[in-house]
Amino acid sequence: MLDKNIVYTPEEGIDQLLKSTTARFKESVDVAIKLSTGDSRSGDSIRGVAVLPKGLGREVRVAVLAKGEYAKQAKDAGADVVGDSDLIEEIKKGRKLDFDWCIATPDFMSQVSAIAKILGPRGLMPNPKFGTVTFDIAKMVGIVKSGQVRFRSDKYGIVHVKIGDVGFSREDLMENLRAVVSAVQGLKPATVKGAFFKAVFLNSTMGKSFRITGLG
């Protein structure tokens, strides 16, 4: 449900959203950003990552594909799943992908490519653009577990990102919202001369949608 005639400041929008939730479970809070670049079918898909300073409100599970000292670093950093060629074989055979992110060292990517068709459609393929192909394993595990989220504009030119849940305070949701807005704004194509954001909305899983302004 959306009243298109009412536009709120980000703080007001969050307040309205938190007041309107009625579900008996902890609803997610999401931001939807309509971009001025058009739909993804025109080749203007926007994709990237944002680090949420207040996290996601849940455990983020991380898998690391590496060997030797890098595998040890991954375990020490708290990675949930760590393996090398054996793990790749398990994934080929249908191992449950019980993780949110997959990180790999650059020297291991030639082997990881063997499961690209499995990881790719689920958004789990290690990607240098997301920082998930790296030798700095410990640092990346920490970043991802702290609340890194990936985003990509859909076929309608809209970016959808979870910024927390209704158990978060207004201040924490604002911090996460600013982080997402900054990350998306940073990907504005040089060909876009005017405003990059056409409209921004906040909504919860089962609640209303609130249009906000003053972010981009």
Curated annotation (Swiss-Prot):
Gene Ontology annotations for the cellular component aspect, listed alphabetically: large ribosomal subunit
SUPFAM superfamilies: Ribosomal protein L1
GO terms (BP aspect): regulation of translation; translation
A GO molecular function held by the record: structural constituent of ribosome
Keywords, ordered alphabetically: Repressor, Ribonucleoprotein, Ribosomal protein, RNA-binding, rRNA-binding, Translation regulation, tRNA-binding
A Pfam family annotated for this UniProt entry: Ribosomal_L1
Source domain of life: Bacteria
Entry annotated with the keyword Repressor: yes
UniProt entry tagged with the keyword Repeat: no
InterPro entries linked to this entry: Ribosom_uL1_bac-type, Ribosomal_uL1, Ribosomal_uL1-like, Ribosomal_uL1/biogenesis, Ribosomal_uL1_3-a/b-sand, Ribosomal_uL1_CS
Oligomer and partners: Part of the 50S ribosomal subunit.
Family membership noted in the UniProt record: Belongs to the universal ribosomal protein uL1 family.
Biological role stated in the UniProt entry: Binds directly to 23S rRNA. The L1 stalk is quite mobile in the ribosome, and is involved in E site tRNA release. Protein L1 is also a translational repressor protein, it controls the translation of the L11 operon by binding to its mRNA.
Alphabetized NCBIfam families for the sequence: rplA_bact
Protein name: Large ribosomal subunit protein uL1
